[in-house]
Amino acid sequence: MPEQAVKQSHDIDALMMTIGAQAKAASRPLSIAGTDQKNRALLAMASAIEASKEAILAANRKDLAAAESAGLAASFVDRLTLNDARIAGIAEGIRSVAALADPVGEVIAAWDRPNGLKIERVRTPLGVIGVIYESRPNVTADAGALCLKAGNAVILRGGSDSQHSSRAIHACLVQGLRIAGLPENAIQLVPVTDRAAVGALLSGLKGTVDVIVPRGGKSLVARVQSEARVPVFAHLEGICHIYVDKSADLDMAKAIVVNAKMRRTGICGAAETLLVDASAVSSHLEPVVKALLDAGCEVRGSQPVRNVVEGLEAATEEDWRTEYLDAIISVAVVDGISGAIEHIGTYSSNHTEAVIAEDPDVVARFFNELDSAILLHNASTQFADGGEFGMGAEIGIATGKMHARGPVGVEQLTSFKYRVHGTGQTRT
């Protein structure tokens, strides 16, 4: 339905209730669809995206022109941008989801009771998932593919900034569903950009939506977490830290820190704070900071850092709490692993942290005493990604402690039920 027609009807709620009912109806046959049928749909989607590359790029150019006219930040435009390589990556991501094991029906635990009952815990789809996102058009494909593989229907509400790109990609997903004989309403894209549609989706649409997954900036995620009446898989922000210990290999530290910050500055796994062991100031601090500066990164330092490296802007209290999503990093000197743990515990968003060290005791403390969703040793924080974890595409990163945590892949989009086999037992 065209957006103008919907706006003229003044009935966003009715539209969303219809979408919710259609998703619920589609979720039933989808929940029992076989692996081969779901994979057929996924492979057809990937092929359709490749075949529609020019149409997708043309749609993306409309979004980019609007973004540039609005003067949006470079990091925002980067997340919005599609090109040949990124479209190929979207198609490959869908194929990687098709190659994953189907979690639905997997027996994840089984045991026998003394009375002879045989009990199995079995993976099942969640049902209907609502995904709310902003500028990343690839989320349309990633979310659609993952939800489908896990047997879930999905309602996609993309941002106005990516509306043309998302519609072009969504058309390819619907084509794949049609080819495989699956309900076309299994993957729906909300056809309006009115924010009232978000509020309706967060209400749960009278019980038709089981989970909400937001992908976007802090204000979006905060609104979702505040208003949602159904469970939410999300992270508020990615304030990711790297700690360089005195035992770290210097060349490794330089390479990892630069990659973690500069590979893609606008993603949630980009490092925002660098912590350097006080015992490594003379050996590691200046070379690592210089590597960042040479890579084009702005460095803001605490006073001990500025005492060693001249010309840096002073880091403020606000900097330690900031997700820059830009070529900016804050650097502090800390009192060894204890100081690093204290700093991270104070300022972390519990997303991703990395330690660069050769001392196994330091690594053990880092892993045992920090509680972020993802902890890395001698590796870039930019590996905080479902694809890099072997999950195929991810629907997001969750930092909560209920149900899903870390990359939300196909397994995390399932629940479970119990199957109990008896031979006539009755309870006394």
Curated annotation (Swiss-Prot):
Its main location: cytoplasm. It holds the Pfam family Aldedh. One of its GO terms (biological process) is L-proline biosynthetic process. Pathway: Amino-acid biosynthesis; L-proline biosynthesis; L-glutamate 5-semialdehyde from L-glutamate: step 2/2. It catalyses: L-glutamate 5-semialdehyde + phosphate + NADP(+) = L-glutamyl 5-phosphate + NADPH + H(+). It is found in: Cytoplasm. Belongs to the gamma-glutamyl phosphate reductase family. It comes from the Bacteria. Keywords: Amino-acid biosynthesis, Cytoplasm, NADP, Oxidoreductase, Proline biosynthesis. Catalyzes the NADPH-dependent reduction of L-glutamate 5-phosphate into L-glutamate 5-semialdehyde and phosphate. The product spontaneously undergoes cyclization to form 1-pyrroline-5-carboxylate. Its EC number is 1.2.1.41. GO terms for molecular function: glutamate-5-semialdehyde dehydrogenase activity; NADP binding. This is Gamma-glutamyl phosphate reductase. InterPro entries: Ald_DH/histidinol_DH, Ald_DH_C, Ald_DH_N, Aldehyde_DH_dom, G-glutamylP_reductase_CS, Glu-5-SA_DH, GPR_dom. One of its GO terms (cellular component) is cytoplasm. The keyword Oxidoreductase applies.
